[in-house]
């Protein structure tokens, strides 16, 4: 006759109900203890008192099993059970997974972390690891089947397995995780880093990696780097130390972290330009596909030419420069009249304005404001020194380092000296050719030849 959960009662040896519990008797009428007995398709465990064990974790040798409220051993099943080792870093309850033979998964004898593929109720297969006691591991996990806890767990952890009710190994995916880092002095750091876990579940460390078309840099502890990072331009014997001029890479904001390629605007890091960093002033940069930024050169981008200093900051405004084959050898921003180069100086003048886009090198005629005064400039439109201010007589004007030479306002006519000769120009700076007895505001008469050179000057015609 059957009783309880699939238990068949026999008159002699076998299962017997004693009025309060099930026991299993041998032929000598001795109740068995600390062993498994089967009834039908289920296994049951008899404890040290000979009674059937119910709703309890059973430790049998080196293995763990669980019997339900009917005493039957469970199989292919998750169970959340009280944790005998609960504490500050341990939960009050832990998860076990009992295989088809009822035995709980646990760490292998080698102690090395081993993941088991388990089909969830949803039909999705995930990978889980367990410690030597059969507890499902979660959070940061090392390679010795142990959880890593504490403020710097992110440094020592190799795998990440979700929270205490998840446990699934993160693989081929990003996770933004809590990470206390006393060494990060960035004011925008919010005690979290992004990490990427390979398909084997291990976090990427100390490497550059392209993921979904974006390039990332990972620190030695696996954190995705962001903002300014100095990266050597080569490895091994060919390695060149990272410096502001050769290896500044920018890896975006903390919520993006990928390598900035093309245009981006940001505050330079202290290793790039300390003054700009302290001033919290943003500049445009142009990121290169393999890291670093364009530095110390003219570069044509989408049909427009721009200038970049030795730290990669886009130039904007009027500059005197020494340039060779588009490489900027020296530069100084001109912010007032006293900084303008003289006729015999070796520097040439360039202007990076606001149209058609900010920072575009100007060519041809344009107006430049300096010290509150507007001047006309003309910059070369072609040649190896395209963009440099023209010198000498050009288009009926006299230019010095690109600046049109003009006379005092209201004078009508005036004299400009160039290469030892005197030329007559009008109020707008245009050379006056073949003029006879034209009079300026001071009642002085002038006559000029076909080149505009003065042939007569006096109070009379």
Language-model regions, residue ranges each:
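Extracellular adhesion/carbohydrate-binding repeat motifs centered on closely spaced tryptophans
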Residues: 1-461
């Amino acid at each position: 006759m059957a009783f309880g959960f699939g238990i068949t009662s026999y008159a002699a040896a076998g299962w017997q109900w004693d009025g309060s519990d099930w026991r299993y008797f041998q032929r000598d009428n001795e109740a068995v203890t600390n062993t498994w007995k089967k009834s039908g398709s289920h296994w049951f465990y008899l404890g040290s008192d000979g009674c059937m064990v119910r709703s309890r974790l059973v430790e049998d040798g080196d293995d763990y099993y669980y019997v339900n409220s009917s005493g039957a051993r469970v199989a292919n099943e998750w169970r959340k059970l009280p944790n005998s080792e609960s504490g500050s870093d341990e939960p009050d309850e832990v998860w076990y997974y009992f295989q088809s033979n009822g035995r709980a998964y646990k760490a292998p004898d080698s102690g090395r972390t081993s993941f088991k593929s388990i089909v969830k109720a949803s039909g999705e297969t995930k990978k889980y690891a367990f410690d030597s006691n059969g507890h499902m591991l979660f959070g940061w996990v090392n390679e010795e089947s142990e959880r890593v806890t504490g403020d710097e767990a992110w440094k020592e952890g190799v795998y990440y397995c979700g929270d205490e009710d998840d446990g699934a190994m993160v693989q081929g995916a990003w996770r933004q995780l809590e990470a206390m880092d006393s060494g990060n002095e960035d004011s925008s750091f919010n005690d979290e880093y992004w990490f990427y876990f390979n398909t084997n579940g291990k976090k990427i460390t100390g490497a550059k990696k392209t993921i979904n078309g974006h390039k990332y840099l990972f620190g030695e502890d696996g954190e995705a780097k962001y903002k300014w990072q100095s990266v050597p331009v080569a490895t091994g014997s060919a390695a060149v130390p990272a410096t502001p001029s050769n290896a500044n890479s920018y890896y975006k904001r903390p919520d993006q972290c990928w390598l900035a390629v093309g245009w981006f605007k940001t505050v330079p890091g202290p290793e790039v330009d300390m003054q700009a960093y302290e001033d919290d002033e943003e500049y445009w940069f142009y990121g290169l596909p393999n890291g670093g930024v364009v530095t110390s050169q003219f570069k044509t981008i989408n049909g427009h030419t721009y200038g970049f200093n030795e730290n990669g900051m886009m130039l904007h405004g009027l500059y005197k420069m020494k340039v060779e084959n588009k490489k900027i050898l020296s530069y100084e921003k001109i912010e007032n009249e006293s900084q303008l180069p003289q006729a015999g100086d070796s520097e040439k003048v360039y202007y990076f304005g606001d149209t058609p886009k900010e920072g575009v090198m100007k060519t041809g005629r344009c107006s430049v404001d300096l010290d509150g005064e507007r001047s006309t400039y003309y910059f070369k439109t072609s040649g190896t020194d395209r963009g440099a201010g023209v010198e000498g007589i050009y288009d009926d004007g006299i230019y010095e380092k690109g600046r049109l030479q003009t006379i005092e306002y209201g004078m009508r006519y005036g004299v400009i000296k160039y290469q030892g000769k005197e030329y007559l120009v009008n109020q707008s700076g245009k050379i006056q050719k073949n003029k006879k007895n034209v009079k300026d505001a001071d009642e002085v008469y002038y006559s000029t030849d076909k080149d505009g050179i003065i042939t007569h000057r006096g109070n009379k015609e």
